[in-house]
Amino acid sequence: MMNEILAAWQWNGSVSEPIPYGEGHINQTYAITVMSKPGAKRYILQKINTDTFKDPEGLMENICGVTEFLRERAKQRGADPARATLHVVPTKEEKPYYQATDGSCWRVYEFVENTVCLQQVQSAEDFYQSAVAFGNFQHQLAEYPSHTLHETIPHFHDTPKRVADFQRAVAEDRMGRAAQVQREIEFVRAREAEYHVMVDLLAAGKLPLRVTHNDTKLNNILFDKTTGEGLCVIDLDTVMPGLAANDFGDSIRFGANHCAEDEADLSKVNFSMELFEIYTKGFLQAAGEAFTPLEKQTLPWGAKLMTMECGMRFLADYLEGDHYFHINYETQNLNRARTQFKLTADMERNWDAMQKVIEKYK
């Protein structure tokens, strides 16, 4: 089967055996090397997870549209387009992906050399550089027509829908676990009035739909090995129309704390205002004039709602029997939910300070 897949592209040289590459969990990723007279050139070969992404054609239309736009913007500002964004290699038939005879879908990217992907924040500078990369992503795509993008995962950051899913999980209580987590359930219910804040502003036309990444974690950036600069945003499968605050908020949820995702000792779970300020500074400086004043004001809401949404999803999965998020022990999803709720409570205690940071860098 792999021979059939590799034969779909014109390589202009001898192709190595694909080697598993990276630490991603959704798509199967391989590195391949093509040997030719000019020398060796590496590529990334990926099997698209069509269980998660049911419309590979729409997904690849999104990725090709956005990366071509980013390449043009890179040329205009004198940057190297080969390092500023991913480059999809078309098949022999000039298609952005290949569907094999077994129905599997595959794509190829050019390998961005001399880069590294970080799995966790090793320094404040790493977090700042990630903020610059995602802020620049927003800046460069500010004029991209977001309405033309396909929704690759419907309702992905639709907080009211996540609340409805959570309430259903509580009501059904399939595993008989709800009685033991009433405190956590009440934590979610006590904030019900807040879950519509962002979608109501969007519906009222007060917030614009942007091109959003929707998975703005540190490990979705390629860093230059030499300079440490955040070069290139990767993992573009979830690029969709969305709210800028959600992209900002997901980064804060993931990065502005020092604890493990499933830390059982909640005294170790603390929201870091220092990291929040570092990220806000880099994100807003790189975004430039891309955002409206109201978008900037809603950035703390993005942090809080993305954290609550994630906590709800962990707790709902725990109530339903841990079918969605992989677990290594029985209460892992419950611990994950509790860390998100502790971060939320910390954000609430620091709410005025968070808004002052936004004001400082807006």
Residue ranges and their predicted role:
Residues 1-19:
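Juxta-kinase regulatory segment immediately upstream of eukaryotic protein kinase catalytic domains
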Residues 18-21, 25-35, 39-168, 242-244, ...:
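Conserved ATP-binding subdomain of kinase catalytic cores across diverse folds
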Residues 19-23, 46-47, 53-57, 112-128, ...:
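ATP-dependent phospho-/nucleotidyl transfer catalytic cores
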Residues 205, 219-260:
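Catalytic activation segment of kinase domains across protein kinase-like and atypical kinase folds
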Residues 245-289, 305-324:
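Active-site activation/catalytic loop segments of kinase-like enzymes and analogous catalytic loops
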Residues 296-306:
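Small/polar glycine-rich anion-binding or flexible loop at a beta-alpha turn
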Residues 347-350:
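Long, compositionally biased intrinsically disordered regions
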